[in-house]
A protein has these predicted regions:
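Canonical radical SAM enzyme core domain
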Residues: 1, 9-22
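Short, surface-exposed basic-aromatic patches at helix termini and helix-loop junctions that form
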Residues: 1-3, 70
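Glycine-enriched alpha-helix->loop->beta-strand junction motifs that scaffold or abut catalytic
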Residues: 3-6, 43-44
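Auxiliary Fe-S-binding modules of radical SAM enzymes
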Residues: 21-141
Length: 141
């Protein structure tokens, strides 16, 4: 184990499905000596997720981000959705679309195909299923 008050994973760019459940869950603090504590239990306190941006950016399938959000929610782990990157799922920001851009489809063997649209990082936004996910871990000093 690595001694740290908060352990986090930055899953960006998220380019495939990830299962973090073996490393999530509740932890207990144990005092091992006066003024010295250690934690027992899973290794992740916070998960940050984001798509890829910039030249040559590859799309992130929406279900990959949803899966990590759902894993975090089930385990009580803080989840922060940083960005979609250059692509946004069709229907995510219908009201801000213009008649320019490219359509693509993101899919892999485990998840169904989804239409996505090339956008600027700013226009793609930060909402996942209608809300921003700005959770931060609770730190006990």
């Amino acid at each position: 184990t690595i001694p740290a008050e908060v352990r986090f994973l930055s899953c960006e760019p998220l380019l495939g499905p990830v299962d973090l459940t073996p490393w999530m869950g509740e932890r207990e603090w144990t005092q091992v000596a006066p003024g010295v504590r250690t934690r027992q239990g899973p290794l992740v306190d916070w998960v940050i997720v984001g798509g890829e941006s910039g030249p040559g950016a590859r799309p992130m399938h929406p279900d990959w981000a949803r899966s990590l959000r759902d894993q975090c929610q089930a385990a009580g782990v803080a989840f922060h959705f940083k960005q979609w990157g250059q692509y946004v799922p069709v229907g995510q920001t219908e009201h801000t679309w213009y008649n320019s851009g490219e359509m693509m489809y993101a899919a892999d063997k485990a998840t169904p195909m989804r239409a996505i649209r090339l956008k600027s990082k700013h226009d793609a936004g930060r909402q996942l299923d209608g809300r921003e996910w700005n959770e931060f871990p609770e730190v006990t000093l």
